Amino acid sequence: MLKTTTVAGLAAVLLTTGLPAEVAQSFAEAVRVQAPAVPSFANVVDAVSPAVVSVRVQARERVSDDESNFTFDFGGRGFEDLPEDHPLRRFFREFAPRENDRADRWRDRRGPRGEGRLRPRAQGSGFFITEDGYLVTNNHVVSDGSAFTVIMNDGTELDAKLVGKDSRTDLAVLKVDDKRKFTYVSFADDEKVRVGDWVVAVGNPFGLGGTVTAGIISARGRDIGSGPYDDYLQVDAAVNRGNSGGPTFNLSGEVVGINTAIFSPSGGNVGIAFAIPASVAKDVVDSLIKDGTVSRGWLGVQIQPVTKDIAESLGLSEANGALVVEPQAGSPGEKAGIKNGDVVTALNGEPVKDPRDLARRVAALRPGSTAEVTLWRSGKSETVNLEIGTLPSDAKEPAPATGEAQPDEGQAGEEALADLGLTVTPSEDGKGVTIASVDPDSDAGDRGLKEGEKIVSVNNQEVKSADDVLKVINNAKKDGRSKALFQIEAQEGSRFVALPITQG
């Protein structure tokens, strides 16, 4: 009977798997994760809520001369055709002088002209980071304000003053001067933050007062186009207007991010919010408390990403680094000899991933310090040492190229670069060649080249004619390259474009 049962069991295995039992048992099992119990956030909320505040911002509206000189003396405006003995004329002659005297007295009480009353300007959130009253919020919450009020979670209202603000990271620090010791929170080590971690957002959405929402970290390192230092955490906790400047906590009650922006077609929460990481906020906040401003390192070069095509055209094995489009005149980069077409591949020995990575790391360097910059130039690696400058407060991108000739159809001197889908003509200023026409079905058309733009160099060699372009391309073919790197100047600025080159 035991033997019969064993055979039956084996038959069942063969029927369900189609394979012998010993083979079936050797397959790896599907991934199984022990599901944790859904946590309660109540303990975290109880601990951190006293440190989170609402921030009310007011601005003193300037009163114009017309407003401060308001008068009841209509001077007969609108009543010019009334007879002299008309009752309305008599009314204004008797009434207006008395009212003007009253208006003058109110102006005297208000003080000098130009100082209007305080008007509500913005409302957001913030949180204490020291027991003596320093608190963090967003720059865009306080930037237009002249008076600031902090509202505690128990309803207490306290005046605050602006310590410093930084528009590039959208952070600001306020200070409440009070004898009490405030409950405060600390920043987390956000290197330990993982996608999928639970987080709790606390703030003041729509001015409702302290509100708690929960979610997870959806992504890290988000670039939302707000500036060169974008490195946001994306969270799906409900964040709305008024949450700006409020904290996002981990389950240990540490601040992992500062709520700054939401993605929303309608203006309401759709589960996509962005928070400044704690590591970025901590450095900026420390500088604002110490100096009232933030000093950043500056290289002074305009850069763009290294695409796979660009990497291939330059002989780079990987599409990493930052391609230098234009060093700014007098900048540390220009003084150190960094040129158009160089690729910054490492900074102080650490590889550079992309332009955003380079911008953040340079900004974090102390002005006046020495940095080692590794470049890829003319097919080989070079290193330059330079002194990091101080980012000017009004630093802008280099001015766009100007003076391009705008060709007409059939312009004399046009030469065809048929394999590229281009015709070009020598530029009027002798610098490069101007694109006269672009085949919309060509690689050049696909990559956005346009009539009137200028080809300044090919593979970092200056060109002044179609023959120059062809010469550089032929040399690239001899070197086994399948792409050539074109430097393009347009009204919007300078950029590099890699175009395929036909072998043969």
UniProtKB/Swiss-Prot annotation:
SMART domains: PDZ. Residues 113-286 are annotated as: Serine protease. Transmembrane segments: none annotated. Residues 287-378, 401-491 form the PDZ domain. InterPro entries: PDZ, PDZ_sf, Pept_S1C_Do, Peptidase_S1_PA, Peptidase_S1C. Residues 102-122, 389-411, 428-447 are annotated as: Disordered. PROSITE patterns: PDZ. It comes from the Bacteria. It is found in: Periplasm. CDD domains: cpPDZ1_DegP-like, cpPDZ2_DegP-like. Residues 102-118 have a biased composition (Basic and acidic residues). Its EC number is 3.4.21.107. The active site is at 140 (charge relay system), 170 (charge relay system), 244 (charge relay system). It is an enzyme of class 3 (hydrolase). Gene3D superfamilies: 2.30.42.10, 2.40.10.120. Belongs to the peptidase S1C family. This is Probable periplasmic serine endoprotease DegP-like. It comes from Rhizobium meliloti (strain 1021) (Ensifer meliloti).
